[in-house]
């Protein structure tokens, strides 16, 4: 149970990187059954055919299921098919729901969720790529992949490691890692800062150590933020069943192979530690302490 606690993190780097990375170079994707999942610029996105007709009757069912007021749904003329869009502000995050007409004349729902302000141009560009079936198949990672595409470098998966989502890898007792590719380094820094603040505010996580450390992240000299969390409440009880008491997290943002990347690496106090690197095996594959 302890390895189900995930973080998206923050580091504080003072370099700038003004070049924008193109959308498809930032996009990650997987397929699972009849759903597609995407990640880009801090968004988590699902695309699913609702199997409902693109008509009044179909929308009535869709809106009722999703607790949507029909008056809140508005067409977007920049989307390349018939559509309705609903924006919802939730506590701590925002959502955009695009109901689009697909080739079967049924409703496909492209659902965006993001911690921070929505980026309409990113949403519209991705929806149009989906509508026109222009997402390259090579971007879809297999669910049972035996390697990690880490910012353009393939890393063999350790035994017993598995994906729990897009760019989320967990290795019981050997560390866990989450990452995302962003348009600019500044975007990555902003995203990780927002997420770190959100995680720190959770009552179940109490930071007992916070410090900046020098590391080599994918062979690039980098400052990482190292935080040790004391875990409380129900999560503490679940983690304690397997011996976990504290969680050490490294928050990093850096440009790697011309890709601005935000990454979190974490491990429990009773995880396996490499005597040479001082880190669990998974973390040791992408980072070294200086």
Locations of the language-model features?
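Surface-exposed amphipathic alpha-helical segments
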Residues: 25-30, 110-161, 258-290
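Hydrophobic residues embedded in beta-strands of well-ordered beta-sheets
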Residues: 105-108, 168-170, 260-261
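Generic structural signal for short, solvent-exposed loop/turn connectors between secondary structure elements
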Residues: 3, 19, 63-73, 164-168, ...
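Flexible, glycine-rich surface segments
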Residues: 147-222, 226, 247
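Bacterial Sec-dependent N-terminal signal peptides
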Residues: 1-23
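Hydrophobic, Leu/Ile/Phe/Ala-enriched alpha-helical segments that form helix-helix packing faces
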Residues: 130, 195-204, 253, 286
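Short, surface-exposed beta-strand/loop "edge" segments at domain boundaries and coil↔beta transitions
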Residues: 87-94, 106-108, 115-123, 176-179, ...
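Signature of long, low-cysteine stretches enriched in small and polar/charged residues
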Residues: 21-104, 203-259
């Amino acid at each position: 149970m302890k390895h189900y606690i995930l973080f998206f993190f923050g580091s504080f780097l003072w370099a700038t990187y003004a070049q924008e990375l193109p959308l498809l170079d930032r996009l990650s994707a997987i397929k699972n059954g009849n759903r597609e999942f995407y990640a880009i610029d801090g968004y988590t996105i699902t695309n699913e055919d609702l199997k409902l007709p693109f008509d009044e009757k179909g929308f009535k069912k869709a809106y009722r299921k999703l607790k949507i007021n029909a008056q809140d749904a508005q067409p977007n003329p920049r989307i390349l098919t018939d559509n309705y869009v609903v924006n919802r502000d939730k506590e701590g995050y925002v959502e955009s729901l695009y109901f689009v007409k697909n080739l079967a004349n049924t409703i496909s729902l492209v659902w965006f969720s993001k911690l921070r302000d929505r980026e309409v141009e990113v949403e519209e560009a991705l929806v149009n790529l989906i509508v026109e079936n222009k997402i390259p198949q090579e971007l879809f990672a297999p669910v049972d992949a035996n390697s990690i595409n880490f910012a353009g470098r393939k890393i063999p998966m350790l035994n017993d490691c598995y994906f729990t989502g897009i760019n989320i890898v967990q290795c019981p007792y050997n560390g866990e890692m989450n990452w995302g590719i962003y348009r600019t380094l500044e975007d990555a820094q902003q995203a990780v800062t927002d997420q770190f603040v959100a995680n720190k505010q959770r009552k179940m996580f109490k930071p007992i150590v916070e410090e900046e450390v020098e590391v080599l992240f994918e062979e690039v000299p980098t400052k990482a933020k190292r935080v040790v969390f004391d875990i409380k409440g129900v999560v503490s009880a679940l983690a304690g069943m397997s011996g976990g008491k504290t969680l050490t997290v490294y928050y990093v943002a850096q440009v790697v192979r011309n890709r601005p990347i935000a990454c979190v690496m974490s491990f429990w106090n009773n995880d396996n530690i490499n005597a040479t690197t001082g880190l669990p095996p998974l973390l040791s594959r992408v980072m070294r302490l200086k």
